Amino acid sequence: MSQKPFRVIIVGGSVTGLTLAHSLHRIGVDYIILEKRAKVVVQEGASIGILPNGARVLDQLGLYNTIEQSAAPPESSHIHFPDGFHFISPYPKRMFESFGYPIAFLERRRLLEILYDTLPDKTKLKVNKTVSDIEQYPEGGKYNARVRTIDGDVYEGDLVVGADGVHSRTRREMWRLSGSSPTGDVPVSERNSTSVEYCCVFGISQGLSGLRVGQQVMRIYNGRTLLVVPSKDELVFWFLSQKLDRKYEYSNAPRFTLEDAAAQCLQVADAPIADGIQFQDIWKTRQAFNMVSLEENLFKTWSFGPIVCIGDSMHKMTINFGQGANCAIEDVAVLSNLINELLLENKGMKPTFRDIEVLLRRFNRMHLSRVSDIFNMSWLVARVHAQDGLLRKIIGRYVMPYLGGRFDSRPFRMIADAAALDFLPLPRSSFPGWKMYKSREGGVVRNVFFLLAATVIVAWVCRLWA
């Protein structure tokens, strides 16, 4: 009997899942995508920001030019505080000059459309396929795993990748299988570690002239942050994040209606955005909007047997730092590199169950610290923007405006340290930031400078308030 080809089952036609499909195609790996919805491309009122670390991988896959044409990158950020102070940060422009990729804001729907339209074989994507259960076969067989959907269909493969978001069914099945194995089981404390402290109203408006493309506006309040990003064709992307009354567990996180969202937005209706324009003018021209809880968590255990979860199913962040999708794209790069390496080492022989298990543990081990750094920065940025606590209020109001580019070095270093596909050329690698900000001993000196400067400013502010 001839050997079946190595096959990956991707659960979720998300940005993460579709990017993985493109990457697997580049290394000649067979795959199938199971999407629970009837359509991949849907309007949910959401936008997405592609930063240089995500952009570079998408560029390697030949997808970025279309994305770039669909976006109007911001050049500056105008940041306003409750006491009337404001400053202009050239952070977006510096990012572009450093890495060759701007912050590309576009509709999430448009990004999904690009990823779907460019799939080499759309028959590999199956819609209306909700996963019911997953089984594994460690004792050998044609394939390592079998995925069954609620309509009774069965799909077999050697590796199952959960790219199905924060409410991941793949993750639950992985936990179920792990719990029945003497070598597995994820601690209950880890399973229940997702929490919610913030919510967000996000939306898209169109048809309002008078906003300058490239000039994003952030208004910082106590416990609340409003971000407005004007784009091309008079599109405006906006976000209103709010600290909740308490910290919730994932299982009892609040759910919101459109009426709840409208009530939140009306509270900042008179917020000035540009000359003669208030947020209520943006609200009146809304096309779509929604309100959701912002889950936060970084799971430590990403795989069991031939099953692995990536993206929001393993690391869910708030929106403020903008790295959620970009971090997921990095997951794709690291996992694809390891799969390609294993296939080359096996020289045509199909990897065994044990091979896949070892590969996934290695993926978890080598990538977790990188994701942890991004997650921790995202956690901090959300709370600085919300002025959550005295120290974080001081950092946002008195440190960030005065340290300028020094404050940019840490997020820039995170971008420079990003994973990329090691089997495809690196475009735009000549831009200075990829080498200048890459972690090295000099980075310690920069951190010491930043901490000393921040300490001096904090001490000065505390003296004023004393």
UniProtKB/Swiss-Prot annotation:
One of its GO terms (cellular component) is membrane. Its EC number is 1.-.-.-. Residues 1-23 form the signal peptide. Pfam families: FAD_binding_3 (PF01494). One of its GO terms (molecular function) is monooxygenase activity. It is found in: Membrane. FAD binds at E35, G49, R108, D312, A325. The chain crosses the membrane at residues 443-465. Diterpenoid pyrones display various biological activities and FDDP E shows anti-HIV activity. FDDP D and FDDP E show also inhibitory activity of 42-mer-amyloid beta aggregation that is involved in the pathogenesis of Alzheimer's disease. Pathway: Secondary metabolite biosynthesis; terpenoid biosynthesis. This is FAD-dependent monooxygenase dpfgE. FAD-dependent monooxygenase; part of the gene cluster that mediates the biosynthesis of diterpenoid pyrones. The first step of the pathway is the synthesis of the alpha-pyrone moiety by the polyketide synthase dpfgA via condensation of one acetyl-CoA starter unit with 3 malonyl-CoA units and 2 methylations. The alpha-pyrone is then combined with geranylgeranyl pyrophosphate (GGPP) formed by the GGPP synthase dpfgD through the action of the prenyltransferase dpfgC to yield a linear alpha-pyrone diterpenoid. Its cofactor is FAD. Glycans are attached at N128, N192, N376. GO terms for biological process: terpenoid biosynthetic process. PANTHER family: FAD-BINDING DOMAIN-CONTAINING PROTEIN-RELATED, FAD-DEPENDENT MONOOXYGENASE ASQG-RELATED. Keywords: FAD, Flavoprotein, Glycoprotein, Membrane, Monooxygenase, Oxidoreductase, Signal, Transmembrane, Transmembrane helix. It is a single-pass membrane protein. Belongs to the paxM FAD-dependent monooxygenase family. The gene is dpfgE.
